[in-house]
Amino acid sequence: MAKNIKTNKKPQQVNKKEMSKQHAKQIKQQLNETVATGIIDGVFVYTEALSIADFANQIGKSVAEILKYFFAQGLMLNQNVVLSEEQMAELALEFGFDFRKEESLTKENFFEALDASEEDKPEDLEHRAPIVTIMGHVDHGKTTLLDSIKNTNVVGGEAGGITQAIGAYQVKNKDGKKITFIDTPGHEAFSEMRSRGANVTDIVILIVAADDGVMPQTEEAIDHAKLANVPIIVFINKCDKPGADPERVKAELMKYEIVAEEYGGDIPFVQGSAKQKIGLDQLEETILLIAEMQDYKANPNKLAKGVVIEAHLDKAKGPVASILVKEGTLDIRDMIIAGTTYGNIKHMEDETNKKVLKAGPSKPVVVYGLNEVPSAGDKFIVMNDEKMARTIAEAQAEKKLAAERQSNQIFSLDSIKKHIDDGELKAINLIVKADTQGSVEALKGSLTKIDIPGVKLNIIRASVGTITLSDVTLASTVTDGIVLIYGFNVRPDAVVRKKAEEEGIEIRLHNIIYKVIEELEDAAKGMLDPEYKEVVTGSAEIRATFKHSDIGTIGGFHITDGSIERKSKVRIIRNGIVIYTGELATLKHLKDDIKEAKINSEGGLTIKNFNDIKEGDIVEGYKEEEVKK
């Protein structure tokens, strides 16, 4: 069995230099260690997922026996299919073997393997400050709440208070208890870190304005908070304003399964005003109560590990990174690996611009000395061996590059049947956006009735509105199975389409509910009709309208993007909602018929069987091309 990496052997008796030396030595041993696999004393031992051919070889069975087993379950597989850990365990038991996974450390799986291998002794753990993230709709008071908390409680009571925008802050209440707040630009950044495996936060505060209620970004924040699977506190803000209605907010949140304790739920609610600093004490008490119940602990007496919160390149100081220590203690002059970067910590300071020499669990600091700028969400670990740090960082960079090259090679709708048969697909995750709440509810009701044997169908978001960057960001955080975004009478703009393509997220657009259901069911059965890719050729803004007695309403247009051809299919978009899809009847420049209108050109158009075109409408031209399989 591979040895666990221990960095906490009697830390009180081992100095930092000796601990670092031992740590580097143990990692070197593990990197060079070959773990014995196969059948050992009647136990199937493995380190990673295996193909059917490799698995059969390791347990001394024929490929035919393995394939026969799956065939009896209705799965037609081949010897190159890579088995999941659950399938290997199932097969091991079927053939009379127990099973055990051994961790094997490599330069490529360095951070993941360390996370899995290190376990602290209970007696080495000490309580740490809870780490809190505030999320909510724009203008509901997130920034004001953070500012009020920072200005009310400053660690150590330093004059001047918190001055640095480092992405995280630690405050101390009147009883001396500390809380760390993560200040991300939005829930997209929060989820981006989570998608990289960096589970940064312990608690999410959902802020909702009492005079505004649940808004679109509130819904998005709820989705992200639930996916993070951490306790949620609701802070109803602006209770001092005219029109404030906290009870309405509580009622609205019930639709999202956010139910207050007073109504039989398990979500604590706090009412107040961030601007007037009302309710802040109760909010902090609630955070600390949850922290006490959850019993957040870490071992401070080991080499530090943590997460990069944000980073940038300073022209004078070089790469600068804001990091959060999750466990252990970071010392100045430590060498760290942070994702694909490494370097000695030459200088370290906190949110008050004060130089610090050490940073323990839950402490955010700014560090200088890395060779390059790391990415938000990168994990870091102390590695006081420069040669090894450089080697591991380079391997991480190669791994990242390979992942980027394959980012578009994900499961597509057309390949669902094959991946189900191969046993590679366990979940289909859907984000559903529609033009009305009625459409949303109808789609949810129909989708939940779909039954695909062996595959779980999850609706991770269903809401009214156009397809946004937030939807694509949420989709990119999903790691289990495939994710599809469905638009019902709504569609993405050019920026969102491009982002989805970059992330390898498939967007499907429909205007008939049963077509969505049929498409998913047929995909599971491998019966999809030829797939047509929609290519948007251009967009035009209607800037004026004219009535004509013979041909109806003429839309005076300006081409804002690409071009629109006379033969193009078009859709009319009003306030982000598709209100009509059809064909052009006429396309003119002055009095002349034209075949195409290019970017920045102007003219007049009419739509077949549609006479309700209005100023401000967007006319989007598109064509359909069959996707070559």
Swiss-Prot record:
Pfam families in alphabetical order: EF-G_D2, GTP_EFTU, IF-2, IF2_N
Family: Belongs to the TRAFAC class translation factor GTPase superfamily. Classic translation factor GTPase family. IF-2 subfamily.
Lineage: superkingdom: Bacteria
Region (G2) location: 161-165
Region (G3): 183-186
Localization in the cell: Cytoplasm
Residues annotated to bind GTP: 136-143, 183-187, 237-240
Role of this protein: One of the essential components for the initiation of protein synthesis. Protects formylmethionyl-tRNA from spontaneous hydrolysis and promotes its binding to the 30S ribosomal subunits. Also involved in the hydrolysis of GTP during the formation of the 70S ribosomal complex.
Protein name: Translation initiation factor IF-2
Region spans: G4: 237-240
Region (G1): 136-143
Chain residue ranges for the region called Disordered: 1-20
Alphabetic keyword roster: Cytoplasm, GTP-binding, Initiation factor, Nucleotide-binding, Protein biosynthesis
The keyword Nucleotide-binding is annotated on this UniProt entry: yes
Segments for region (G5): 273-275
A GO MF label: GTP binding
Record-linked HAMAP family: IF_2_B
Domain tr-type G stretches: 127-297
GO cellular component annotations of the record: cytosol
Organism field: Mesoplasma florum (strain ATCC 33453 / NBRC 100688 / NCTC 11704 / L1)
